[in-house]
Amino acid sequence: MPDGGLIIAIDGPSGTGKSTTSRALATRLNAKYLDTGAMYRVATLHVLNQGIDPADTDAVITATAALPLAISDDPSSTEVLLAGVDVQTEIRGPEVTSHVSAVSAIPEVRDNLVNLQRALADRAHRCVVEGRDIGTVVLVDAPVKAYLTASPEVRAQRRYDQDTAAGRAADFDEVLAAVVKRDELDSTRAASPLKPAEDAHIIDTSAMTMDEVLTHLIQLTEASAERSNQ
């Protein structure tokens, strides 16, 4: 495995296996892990907790300007703190999920969080960074970039399985509709639309196991390290 500084950018829509694979990859590489999607979810929860309409752009910008957020970079931890309270369960709830695209589409919100994401990745030095615009905006110089994708139906089934396993009520048709809607919102927004970086390796995980995806990512990382040593 490559030693020293290492930044791996993993992008893609929800339900592609990004989080599970990114955490496993960080563990295998003895690296830190940063879930940027969780940061936008915390911002959304903060807005909702204050009774702010996510469509009120000015109010959202003001509320998230100094977000009291702390997120673990340990790949074995899911702790996410908002004002000192662990909100890892709340940020995955249906209300946050239905509004996170609107909040994350606001350029000022993205600018604030992108600056924080860059600082955290730089401090970690060796980090797997997961999100939707890591390779295209946040860390454009990352030596390893992967874009995970899968069919909407497969991704909806995975999300449905996650929700039911966590004890959250879920309806497959509603989950599928939400997946399709968020894809459209994220890929058409003006600020940092969801799309693969030109130099990203695109991996369709529809028919792949997590171990197969992990093996592919490790091979990409090792190949990148070999090129940098030549």
Curated annotation (Swiss-Prot):
<keyword id="KW-0547">Nucleotide-binding</keyword>
<comment type="similarity">
    <text>Belongs to the cytidylate kinase family. Type 1 subfamily.</text>
</comment>
<dbReference type="GO" id="GO:0015949">
    <property type="term" value="P:nucleobase-containing small molecule interconversion"/>
</dbReference>
<protein>
    <recommendedName>
        <fullName>Cytidylate kinase</fullName>
        <ecNumber>2.7.4.25</ecNumber>
    </recommendedName>
</protein>
<keyword id="KW-0808">Transferase</keyword>
<dbReference type="GO" id="GO:0005829">
    <property type="term" value="C:cytosol"/>
</dbReference>
<dbReference type="GO" id="GO:0005524">
    <property type="term" value="F:ATP binding"/>
</dbReference>
<keyword id="KW-0418">Kinase</keyword>
<dbReference type="InterPro" id="IPR011994">
    <property type="entry name" value="Cytidylate_kinase_dom"/>
</dbReference>
<keyword id="KW-0963">Cytoplasm</keyword>
<feature type="binding site">
    <location>
        <begin position="12"/>
        <end position="20"/>
    </location>
    <ligand>
        <name>ATP</name>
    </ligand>
</feature>
<dbReference type="InterPro" id="IPR003136">
    <property type="entry name" value="Cytidylate_kin"/>
</dbReference>
<dbReference type="Pfam" id="PF02224">
    <property type="entry name" value="Cytidylate_kin"/>
</dbReference>
<dbReference type="GO" id="GO:0006220">
    <property type="term" value="P:pyrimidine nucleotide metabolic process"/>
</dbReference>
<dbReference type="GO" id="GO:0036431">
    <property type="term" value="F:dCMP kinase activity"/>
</dbReference>
<keyword id="KW-0067">ATP-binding</keyword>
<dbReference type="InterPro" id="IPR027417">
    <property type="entry name" value="P-loop_NTPase"/>
</dbReference>
<dbReference type="GO" id="GO:0036430">
    <property type="term" value="F:CMP kinase activity"/>
</dbReference>
